[in-house]
Amino acid sequence: MVITHHGGQCFKVTFGDLTLVFDPIAKNSTLPPVRFGADIALVSRDHPDMNGVEEVTYGDKVPFVIAGPGEYERQGVVVQGFLSKSVYGLDKGQTEAVNTIYSVELEDMTLVHLGALADTELSKEARENIDDIDVLFVPIGGLSAQASDGVLSPADAHKLAVSLEPKIIVPMHWSLLAQTGGIGKSKALETYLKEAGNSSEKVEKLTLKKKDLIGHDGSILVLTP
């Protein structure tokens, strides 16, 4: 399995001839859109920063789209989606939006992508069904209740990530802030790593097999877009 970061909350996961993408970036996003073919596309939040299904419909690949809670299976990949809340990128008059947390099982590993999560606790259903996480993608954009980007603050992100006991933690959403600007917001990654207090490693891509997870216990890996 090879995991690469394409900005914001977008991660491409390839294994064999199959490509899965979390939160592909659309053309009308403030972020650079993605452009590659995917077999499976998971959309956590209906927003241009995360719903670019057309951009991953490319060549001979037309993705099977998952855009909400439920149980799914496609080409040997098992996906569970759990309802949660986001306050990211709300339209005028909105107070909250639907966010979907995804648990994906493939190659004997479990990947969990929290999406644009604002809830500091997972639902009972998610807690009961998500277990033994190998790779956790956690949003770290909001800096505080007063200067929130609509997702978890670095402190809340760290607390939730630790409670889920993943083998590897991959922070996300920080590059979205760095690219779109905002006072202090581009420092979200620095703030998160300071909050976490343990060492981290920056990599351009994550090549992973089940055996590689031995010895990992909450290791933080920063995938650079």
Language-model regions, residue ranges each:
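Core dinuclear metal-dependent hydrolase active-site scaffold
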Residues: 1-40, 47-49, 62-131, 135, ...
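Binuclear metal-ion centers of metallo-dependent hydrolases, dominated by the metallo-beta-lactamase
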Residues: 4, 8, 96, 158, ...
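Non-globular, low-confidence helical/coil segments that flank catalytic cores
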Residues: 38-40, 50-88, 159-162, 168, ...
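Hydrophobic, well-ordered secondary-structure segments
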Residues: 130-133, 137, 154-158, 166, ...
